[in-house]
A protein has these predicted regions:
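Charged, alpha-helix-forming regions
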Residues: 1-243
């Protein structure tokens, strides 16, 4: 019961931090009417990916950028032995199809190197046309789960974003120095959230192991009258606390 309560508490903390991040990201990227607006088609090129089902290989050279890869921030990977639709440094990949109320629709991934990634079907690829007008990382933050695209999810049917649905959305274009400042702020906030994503699950696992250890100690003592010998690591940990 105790470990379940701790897990629930830490999971709730993680969820709250994610919600807080989304709130502030939306707030930072909301502009008044004085800021110029351009359509996405005016600031970025677009292409659709290709099917890689026949080219999947465990030891393939290329990472297939599909919806699972993007929705897990690159944690779930499939490889291909062919680069059917190459992606390049600073390309932005976006999920164009998802289940009703899915968390992947319009989620984006920023490509960090050449000759490594290949774009799968139903994933859109974007590249900024002019960095003097729109900074790539700023555009990434604008596009990622953009509310203008999420409105196509009716909560009942599979959502399939069309090319024009995407290219017609409005992109606020503040001054370049403002874009860079926003990127700096969002990068830092994103890093904090990423640390939480790593730290809190690790804390849950540590608490679970701690609970299991003391449970085994108590059960062994109840059954045999003996106490489980501590491991060197546990002894070191207790010694550190007293030093």
């Amino acid at each position: 019961l105790l470990t379940a309560e701790l897990t629930a508490e830490l999971t709730a903390e993680l969820t709250a931090r994610k919600s807080q991040y989304e709130f502030y990201r939306r707030k930072l990227l909301t502009f008044d009417e004085s800021i110029p607006q351009l359509q996405l088609r005016d600031v970025a090129s677009f292409r659709n990916g290709k099917g890689h089902e026949k080219n999947i290989a465990d030891n393939g050279k290329y990472v297939v950028v599909n919806s699972k890869f993007i929705s897990t921030n690159g944690q779930v990977i499939k490889n291909s032995d062919e680069q059917l639709s190459p992606l390049y440094f600073d390309d932005i990949a976006m999920v164009m199809s998802d289940l009703p109320n899915g968390r992947a629709l319009a989620k984006c991934y920023l490509i960090d190197k050449d000759d490594k990634f290949t774009l799968n079907q139903r994933i859109g690829g974007f590249h900024t046309l002019d960095e003097n007008i729109v900074v790539t990382k700023y555009l990434f933050y604008i596009l990622d789960r953009n509310w203008q695209l999420l409105k196509y999810d009716n909560g009942v049917d599979q959502t399939n974003l069309k090319k024009d649905d995407i290219l017609n959305i409005s992109i606020p274009v503040p001054a370049i120095d403002v874009q860079k400042r926003l990127v700096y702020m969002l990068d830092n906030f994103d890093a904090i959230c990423s640390d939480l994503n790593i730290g809190l699950p690790a804390e849950i696992e540590a608490r679970q192991k701690q609970y299991e250890y003391y449970r085994d100690v108590l059960l062994t003592y109840a059954a045999t009258g003996k106490i489980i010998a501590q491991t060197d690591r546990q002894t070191d940990r207790q010694t550190d606390k007293h030093n």
